[in-house]
UniProtKB/Swiss-Prot annotation:
One of its GO terms (molecular function) is protein C-terminal leucine carboxyl O-methyltransferase activity. It comes from the Eukaryota. One of its GO terms (biological process) is regulation of autophagy. InterPro entries: LCMT1 (IPR016651), Ppm1/Ppm2/Tcmp (IPR007213), SAM-dependent_MTases_sf (IPR029063). It is an enzyme of class 2 (transferase). Methylates the carboxyl group of the C-terminal leucine residue of protein phosphatase 2A catalytic subunits to form alpha-leucine ester residues. This is Leucine carboxyl methyltransferase 1.
Amino acid sequence: MELAVQRTDTDALSSKVSAIHTKYLSGGISQQFAYEEVYGEYLASLRQVSRRVFGKCRYSGASFPVMNYGTYLRTVAIDERVLEFLQCNSGSQVQIVNIGCGSDLRMVSVLAKHSNVKYIDLDFKESVELKRQVLEKSSTLSSYLKNDNYVLRSCDLRDVPDTLELLNEECKPELPTLIISECVLCYMPEKETQSLIDGIIRLFKNGSWVSYDPMGGSDKNDRFGVIMQQNLRDSRQLEMPTLLINNSPEIYASRWTPNSDEQFERVVTDMWTYYNDKVPAEEKQRIKRLQFLDELEELKVMQSHYVIFFCKWNANPN
């Protein structure tokens, strides 16, 4: 199961490369993360480190439009919250913690532009070692491993006490902190997920959290989650323990609860609603011109089963 989860990062990287190759991430707010340049450099190094992983990414430029739309939406939805966090705390020392970071490279543009940010990437040991080796091979990206504001550490998020101890060691709990969990919590057991959420909310006094995951669907006739789960078992020997439990945006969001004396706000929506309500009309037109999309109903069904969640809390508002 652990190895199967780690391999999902190759899928995520391939999807990101496809969306970059087809220019989905060349406009809108994602321009600020310079994905084409950063991932181009990363792939060049990846080729030297792991031809197996590189080979899977190399041919990903032909992803179906509906898949590129999905990658675009999850990327910009998280980018939006990262930029908002940075803008709201532009004069303060802050922290960003990406749990289950995989090959995500947001830290490159964030650290290049914001000297007030400490950026912590956490994932399984094998994933972290691959990322470290790839970064080291790059004359450009290797500098981030020497940056005092960047931390790349291995941990098993299911071991909640160890994870919280690591966070307490690397972070200052009193500083504003943004947690990112992108398609991560869905692979964790419910008990450990809840314990991790509760522990992080207790640890950081002024925190924000953006999370993206699939959800099974709450309608009794909705078979999306059941079919997805069965396909993952058959093809990947992979489980999503909470897919059918946290099957609506409201249930998904209910796991984040404040301590009694905290200011707390919470926003959650499915990705189809996000696309319709949050993506500007001109941006919709831009991506529409990139590839012909004739599966609009399929896009609606798929994105209705993914959720973007955001919350922030402050235990010391005064």
